[in-house]
Amino acid sequence: MSHFGDHVGIDPAIMKQYSEHHNGSHDNDDKDKEDKEKQNTEAVAAAAVQLDASLLASGILDDFEKAKKEEEEANGNNNASNDQQNASDRHVGDMLEQHSQQHQQSQEHDTSYINTYIEDKVPLTSVLIPGDRRVSDREASDRIAATTRRVRLRWTQEETADLMEGCKVHGVGNWKKILTDPRFRFNNRTAVDLKDRFRTCFPEDYRRLYPNARSRKFGKKTNVMAVNDDLVKVNRKERRVFTPEEDERLLNGFMKHGPSWSNIQRDNELGLFERRSTDLRDRFRNAFPLEYAAAGFKARGPKRRPVVEATHGNTLQTIFSASDGSEMSPRKYHRVQEQMDRQPVMRVHPQAPMDQGVDRDHMTQQFTQELQPQAHSRKQQGGDGLKEEVFAAAQNQSYNNYYYQK
């Protein structure tokens, strides 16, 4: 440092004073560091003493030292057998588990410090501390579900008889009352089980009482064991035509609930609960097609009827058109146009009522009589005219059957 002061021209006394101060500051830093380490060591020792005091007060430390001493003596004895060693290990584990449970019940000490101290001195093995493995929530729920899952039991004749008697007393549908009635005995059943059993034994009555239920189709094989011969089979409900009053109530229900057929069927003011929701929908579509289409549903289109005229020069778009004015598709137009180019259109009176349709048999007979002289003359000329005319007649008749339908 003095050489550096001489080189730069600094007073040696000042450099000496600076050097003493600099070395003293380093000594002070080292001293502070040693003091802090000493304080930390004393704090750790005090915490260990306090922890040992708490363990000693609870009795765990003495028992642990005693168990450890017994374990060392057992390990030092070379003549001891493996059975004695295992017994000693189990004894130590039982003692530790017992004291751990006692300490958890008391609220005087912190359990986390004790567990940390034990983990530092005792290896955590399955022999010393059995059953210490944590179980996940999913595994616990699976165990609970496995123990609480019910075993399905076959219905007996006594249970089925009690179910029938309960339906007579409380009525069909009051499954909770039937289940809780002390007069009837059921083997670990629920209200849903009673309902399912009734549906199995009486499928027709179930469909009548629950018209909107989507139940599976029952096969030919039935459970004969549970059904008694004394049961009275209810006659199936016959189909009834909708009356004008029902149509009016159906229209009012549509104005009130919209296209919600289930709500219309359950509305007590309308009185349509005897009808199914699908029946109400189909009836409304047929009776009120305009309102049905206005609601956004696809109504059934009008049937195509021929507009017949007696001339051959009319186009197909004029002869065959829908009542709503829509034209024929181009594909059908070209197919029929080719047939009309080969054969004339059937002669149908233009004033014939469309509701009566067309007498196809009479028209075919008349058409055949007109073709016979022409075919006979062509046959005499040596040509195959009869075969051609018969084929044309059959083709024209198929054309008539396809387009001239009622």
Curated annotation (Swiss-Prot):
Keyword match DNA-binding: yes
Domain Myb-like positions: 234-288
Alphabetized InterPro entries for the sequence: Homeodomain-like_sf, Myb_dom, SANT/Myb, TRBD-Containing_Protein
One GO location term (cellular component): nucleus
Region called Disordered, residue ranges: 20-46, 368-389
The entry's keywords: Chromosome, DNA-binding, Nucleus, Telomere
Gene3D superfamilies linked to this entry: Homeodomain-like
The entry's DNA-binding region: 175-202
Domain HTH myb-type span(s) in chain numbering: 147-206
Highest taxon listed in the record's lineage: Eukaryota
Compartmental location: Nucleus; Chromosome, Telomere
Pfam families in UniProt: Myb_DNA-binding
Record carries keyword Nucleus: yes
GO molecular function: DNA binding
Biased composition (Basic and acidic residues): 20-40
Entry domain remark: The presence of both Myb domains is required for high affinity telomeric DNA-binding.
Biological role stated in the UniProt entry: Telomere-binding protein that mediates telomere clustering by promoting formation of head-to-head dimers of DNA molecules through the telomeric tracts. Binds specifically 5'-TTAGTCAGGG-3' repeats in subtelomeric regions.
Name of the featured protein: telomere-associated protein 1
The species this protein was found in: Yarrowia lipolytica (strain CLIB 122 / E 150)
